[in-house]
Amino acid sequence: PSKTTADSIEILESWDGDGCIALFANQNTISYFSKEKINLPTIDIGLSDHGISLNRVVTDNKEVMRLAVNHIVDQGYKEIFTVSPGDNKMCVERFTYLQEFMKQKKGKVHILKNAQHSPSNFHIQISDNIIKELEEIAIARNLIDVNQLSIAFFAYDDVMAAQMIRTLRQYDVRIPESVAVLGVDNDELVNCALNIELSSVDCDLEGLGEKAALELKKVLDDPKYADGKIVRHKPRKLVPRRSTDTYAVNSTIVSSALRWINENFQTGILASDVAEHLNITQQGLQKAFQDHYIRTPGQEIRYQRTIAVANLLECT
């Protein structure tokens, strides 16, 4: 059963397989399943509160949000904007951990009000009115317009992130310079349809499906194993792309330095090389970083190298 169809009753009616891996999102499908297919061994890959005692295999949202928050904070942001999660259990979990990790980082989470929840609470629609809300935020911060902002927006999934990007583009809001956008799922179909590549948490959906198949086999082998347990599947990594490729700093010196470090850290540069490239003193560079960024120039160089090494090790 799919979250993209009105219901999946016809699929279930003709289903003659031994078991089922499903994402329950439609109330008609849930009602039919609970009446007609309740004895069919099934693994649910969602968190819908349907009242059926099914084993579940779902994304580890705590680790998803750890990756998301670390990435946004590493870009220099001290606040994250998002929308209300509504009653969607998956989004509620992500929002809860978003708040928890931002609090640990001494950051803030702000909720934008102009989003609409579908009756099933499975989809959250980004409204054009969100631009007006961003304009009000800019005015409250004594800025000329939205393009003077430097904020990060977290979307609960890539579909929502794509909606946000299209809305921002429609109103000529700069991405990522004014609004950086981060999604979840690393959905290549969504990303290839965007003219700005989307940074996203790769939830390893293929691995989740494999784990769900293993759990289904356990239920098929021993029906007593079906006791409503929830198995969490860790995300693979965060995939940085253009939509967050910026640094939230109120200093052209620091911004230029960070971009140059990002382009040259692998060549053996030192903090003194950064200062020389920018034609400023080392003391001036250190002072600018101290006032406007979370790391010193030397720490940033070492950090970029550490991340690069970690990525290489992951690929070997």
Question: Where are these predicted regions, by residue range?
Answer:
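Bacterial carbohydrate/catabolite-sensing allosteric modules
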Residues: 1-22, 29-271, 275-277, 282, ...
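Terminal helix-turn-helix DNA-binding modules in bacterial transcription factors
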Residues: 291-316
